[in-house]
């Protein structure tokens, strides 16, 4: 509407400078509007802890200039917070198990570590965390290596223990160095809940050159209280990239410990599929955290999740991993085709096996996504 008005406006002959400025502004607006039409919007959605924000960070590393030193340093307090919060969760979890579990003895923290544990638990309760010094790192290492804490860590799925735990606990001496600057790997493991909306613009890199497509990717808060903020992004979206952490079939939500994470993911996926504004939107489903899934499935049966209660294991080892993965994949396919006819050509649906922390996997996946969306665009233009 603004463009139409500006084109019809008569410039005053008495002020050539003002006329020139107005004409330049009009040219810029028109240019930006045309450029915007060529940018495809991707909406990155998923429940909390699905790994979508790690995907977002990988895009920045893969298809942009990455993180400069200032950005890397900005993650230092986040990483320290992850360390302190995690060791507190493990300490407090061990104490609870020592009181209530049938095998309570193995969760009793050793006398040598008790005082350290209480100190670190208190630090983990603060609003402001101290700088991670060598002395504090040594104390955290001592508690981490305690047998009771290791037994508790083995039951991390019951205690909201984050996926980054082992990585940071094994790098404490480096993290506590006086001149510490987070690495790209540290940033990828750093856990901070997305609130609100963040965006990034990129063009995927193929084997020989950049794709001709330009994408704007929006990452939206995954926790329940963030979802009401999504609605203004829905219109005009080329595709939804939905992240589902398939390894979390035996875990509960951070914000509601009575709710299984995969059940929440199922319900969220169903809800998104039913939104009228996604009637013709393509869906790229990332079955994420496969690296954790393939280890867990050999020890924790898939049917502990209500959604997968009809699952029947077939064997062990790699064959069982693939069988379980295909079962989960089929469940998501069934959800999708409940809302979309299988023979529809105006709405693309693809499923990808992903590990957000694996840069090669993410790069390959986005190359495939790019190819899929480019083919869809050619089809819509009548060129296929």
UniProtKB/Swiss-Prot annotation:
Region (G2 motif): 186-194
Lipidation (S-palmitoyl cysteine): 5
Pfam families from the UniProt entry: G-alpha (PF00503)
Spans annotated as G3 motif: 215-224
CDD domains documented for this protein: G-alpha
Keywords attached to this entry: GTP-binding, Hydrolase, Lipoprotein, Magnesium, Metal-binding, Myristate, Nucleotide-binding, Palmitate, Transducer
Region annotation (Disordered) ranges: 1-23
Binding site for Mg(2+): 53, 194
PANTHER family assigned: GTP-BINDING PROTEIN ALPHA SUBUNIT (PTHR10218), GUANINE NUCLEOTIDE-BINDING PROTEIN ALPHA-5 SUBUNIT (PTHR10218:SF302)
Designated name of the protein: Guanine nucleotide-binding protein alpha-2 subunit
Species name: Pisum sativum
């Amino acid at each position: 509407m603004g463009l139409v008005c500006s084109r019809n406006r008569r410039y005053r002959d008495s002020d050539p400078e003002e006329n020139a400025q107005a004409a330049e502004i009009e040219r810029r607006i028109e240019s930006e509007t045309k450029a915007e039409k060529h940018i495809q919007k991707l909406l990155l959605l998923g429940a909390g802890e699905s790994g979508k924000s790690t995907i977002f960070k990988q895009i920045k590393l893969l298809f942009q200039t990455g993180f400069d030193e200032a950005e890397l340093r900005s993650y230092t307090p986040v990483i320290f917070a992850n360390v302190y919060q995690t060791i507190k969760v493990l300490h407090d979890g061990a104490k609870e198990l020592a009181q209530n579990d049938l095998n309570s003895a193995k969760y009793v923290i050793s006398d040598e570590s008790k005082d350290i544990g209480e100190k670190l638990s208190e630090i983990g309760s603060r609003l402001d965390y101290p700088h991670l010094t060598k002395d504090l790192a040594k104390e955290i290492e001592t508690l981490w290596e305690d047998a009771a804490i290791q037994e508790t860590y083995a039951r991390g799925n019951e205690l909201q223990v984050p996926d980054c735990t082992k990585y940071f606990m094994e790098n404490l001496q480096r993290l506590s160095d006086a001149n510490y600057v987070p690495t790209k790997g540290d940033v990828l493991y750093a856990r901070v809940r997305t609130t609100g909306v963040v965006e990034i613009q990129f063009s995927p890199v193929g084997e020989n050159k950049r794709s001709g497509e330009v994408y704007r990717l929006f990452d939206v808060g995954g926790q329940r209280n963030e979802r009401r903020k999504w609605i203004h992004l829905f219109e005009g979206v080329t595709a939804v990239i939905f992240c589902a952490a398939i390894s979390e079939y035996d875990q509960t939500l951070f914000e509601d410990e009575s709710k299984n994470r995969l059940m929440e993911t199922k319900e969220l996926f169903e809800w998104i599929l039913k939104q009228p504004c996604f009637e013709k939107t393509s869906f790229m489903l990332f079955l994420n955290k496969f690296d954790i899934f393939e280890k867990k499935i050999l020890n924790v049966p898939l049917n502990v999740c209500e959604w997968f209660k009809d699952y029947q294991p077939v064997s062990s080892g790699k064959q069982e991993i693939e069988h379980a993965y295909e079962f989960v994949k089929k469940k998501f396919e069934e959800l999708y085709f409940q809302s979309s006819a299988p023979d529809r050509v105006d709405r693309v649906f693809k499923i990808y096996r992903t590990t957000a922390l694996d840069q090669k996997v993410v790069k390959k996946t986005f190359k495939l996504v790019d190819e899929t969306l480019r083919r869809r665009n050619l089809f819509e233009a009548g060129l296929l």
